[in-house]
Structure formats: C-alpha cells, structure tokens
Regions:
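Non-heme Fe(II) oxygenase catalytic core, chiefly the N-lobe of the double-stranded beta-helix
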Residues: 2-211
C-alpha cells in the first residue's frame, strides 16, 4: 500500500528543481531552460475579451491559406496540419483567420516554423494578438517572460521510476487552467527539442463529450 504523501500526482515532464549545469551542453535552446524568478502575480481582474476569430468575414481564409498552403486533417472532428505558412509572415487579418481555423479544428499543427528561433519576445508579441497572457504560478518559465510554461524532462529517472510504481502508463491527461474564471482561449505549444520517437502529446475534443 502506498502512503498518501508518497503519491506523485504532478506532471513528470515538468521539473520542480533548478536545472543542473550538466544539462546545458545537451540543450539546443538553453534560454528556455526553466527558471523560477521570484515574481508575485496580483489577481487578474475581469476583462472584456474579443475573440479574433469573430472578425473573420471571408471563410475561405485568403490571408492565411494562400496558394502555397497545404491543409490535411488528422481526424474528422479534431486536428489539422497546415504546411506552407510561416506565422512570422502573417498579417493581422491572417492571424484572425488562424484563430478562426483553430475554432473550427481545435488543434492546428504548423511544422517548420522560424518563430521557434525568433526568441521569447517575438513569440510573446505574436500570441498577444489572440488575447491576454496567462501566467502559470507554479512552473518554471523563461527569465523576463513569465507567460511561458516550460515542459522539460531533466533526466529525473528516479522520479519517473517512482511514478511508474503507482501507474500502468505514462499517459497523463489534464485540462489547462480550467479553474480560472476566464481561462485561456488560445495556447501555443512549440517543440524545441525532443526524441526521434515517443513523447507524443495527445489532444481530445472535450466539447464532443457534451453532445
């Protein structure tokens, strides 16, 4: 029988300790290694939110899906892959149309983005088009950019072994900050460095469960 205080219930991909120096030589994007700045967040007051998807009038999405764009669906109800589109080249109308496409397909995968190398400031600027930033108060982030939530496997093999003593799978499901009064409308997930296989992120359409 496992004692209650021994149960690991948090995400095993998110370290809760400082990154050790021997991690850095094997890390391609060292600026994104998690840090814990001593920052206090005041309660976020209610605010008016205007979804950029509602500004779209032409449902053919001409500013997003240009002649170079290729769209393929992953599942009938959820997920599409869009190739031939660079996020850094999108106009404001193109970003609105991206929001509309996300509202229809829930998850959009955009491979080979140069936004990955543009740095956290440019990435934050891009996401500001879609609404106010959300801050994760308990996870590591990028110095000077508290709106980033860093998912990092830091070689915590002992922790993972302990986790698997209590579980029959490494698959973990969660719903992002659904406890908030005004949860995020859009989330951008970028893969900086990962294994050749494994480490998959799975998405589910929770709205379908209510039909």
């Amino acid at each position: 029988m496992v004692a209650t205080n021994d149960v690991i219930s948090y995400d095993i991909n998110v370290p809760y300790t400082e990154v050790e120096e021997d991690t850095r030589p094997n890390t391609k994007y060292t600026r994104y290694l998690p840090t814990w700045d001593k920052i206090r967040f005041d309660p976020l007051p209610p605010f008016q939110y205007h979804d950029p998807a509602l500004r779209v009038r032409d449902k053919s999405l001409p500013n997003l899906l240009t002649r170079n764009a290729e769209v393929s669906d992953i599942q009938p109800m959820l997920g599409s892959i869009v190739k031939g589109v660079q996020l850094t080249d999108l106009s404001d109308r193109g970003k609105d149309e991206l929001a509309y496409l996300i509202s229809q397909r829930k998850v959009i995968v955009l491979p080979d983005q140069d936004l990955i190398d543009a740095g956290p400031a440019k990435q934050s600027e891009f996401m500001s088009h879609f609404g106010k930033p959300n801050y994760q108060p308990v996870s590591g982030t990028v110095p000077g950019h508290p709106g980033f939530h860093i998912i990092h496997r830091n070689g915590n093999k002992d922790e993972i072994a302990k986790f698997l003593e209590q579980k029959t799978t490494t698959s973990l499901w969660h719903q992002d900050v659904s406890y908030e009064i005004q949860p995020p409308g859009y989330v951008m997930l970028g893969l900086l460095q990962g294994p050749e296989v494994g480490g998959d992120t799975v998405f589910a359409a929770a709205d379908v469960a209510y039909r």
